Amino acid sequence: MANSSSGVAIHDDCKLKFNELQSKRMHRFITFMMDNKGKEIIVDKIGDRTTSYEDFTSSLPEGDCRFAIYDFDFLTAEDVPKSRIFYILWSPDNAKVRSKMLYASSNERFKKELNGIQLEVQATDAGEISLDALKDRVK
């Protein structure tokens, strides 16, 4: 399906893999990227349930943008286990301007395709998506 503001299509696997993460809890994270022609959003990487948060953050490229979903498990102040699905727009400062613009213009439309996102983060550096930063968001 094409994105009206950027003309970018969203591959069917994106929604399928998101639903596997959300409903079946098959994955810990999914990263999504533009294909080489900048015409379609595709699945980039998938981390299984045993994948660490460090593995997730190291999967994000230092010099390019990505969309990402992370299923964050945590304990409440009352020691109740909970989970929140984070949507992350990764747009590092040193990414190419064209890439930043393409991801920014596709962001809202892509987010709407992934029904069930609970929290959103737009990050330009690793500190903005540190484990502590996510913990602060779920308090």
From Swiss-Prot:
State the family named in the UniProt similarity comment for this chain: Belongs to the actin-binding proteins ADF family.
What is the species listed in this Swiss-Prot or TrEMBL entry?
Oryza sativa subsp. japonica
Gene Ontology CC entries for this record: actin cytoskeleton; cytoplasm
Q: Report the subcellular localization.
A: Cytoplasm, Cytoskeleton
Record keywords: Actin-binding, Cytoplasm, Cytoskeleton, Plant defense
Predominantly, its location class is cytoplasm
- Tell me the ranges covered by the ADF-H domain, including all copies: 5-139
Q: Which Pfam families match?
A: Cofilin_ADF (PF00241)
**Phenotype upon gene inactivation:** Decreased germination rates due to decreased alpha-amylase activity during seed germination. Increased susceptibility to infection by the fungal blast (Magnaporthe grisea), bacterial blight (Xanthomonas oryzae pv. oryzae, Xoo) and the herbivorous insect brown planthopper (Nilaparvata lugens, BPH). Almost no induction of the defense-related genes PR1A, LOX2 and CHS1 after exposure to biotic stresses.
Quaternary structure per UniProt? Interacts with LECRK1 (via kinase domain).
The record's annotation in SUPFAM superfamilies points to: Actin depolymerizing proteins
**Which Gene Ontology molecular function entries are recorded, alphabetically?**
actin filament binding
- Secretion signal span: none
Q: What is this protein called?
A: Actin-depolymerizing factor 4
What this protein is reported to do is described as:
Actin-depolymerizing protein. Severs actin filaments (F-actin) and binds to actin monomers. Involved in innate immunity. Required for the expression of defense-related genes PR1A, LOX2 and CHS1 upon biotic stresses. Required for basal resistance to the fungal blast (Magnaporthe grisea), bacterial blight (Xanthomonas oryzae pv. oryzae, Xoo) and the herbivorous insect brown planthopper (Nilaparvata lugens, BPH). Involved in the promotion of seed germination. Required for the expression of alpha-amylase genes during seed germination.
Under the heading PANTHER family, the entry gives: COFILIN-RELATED (PTHR11913)
Instruction: Give me any GO biological process, just one.
Output: actin filament depolymerization
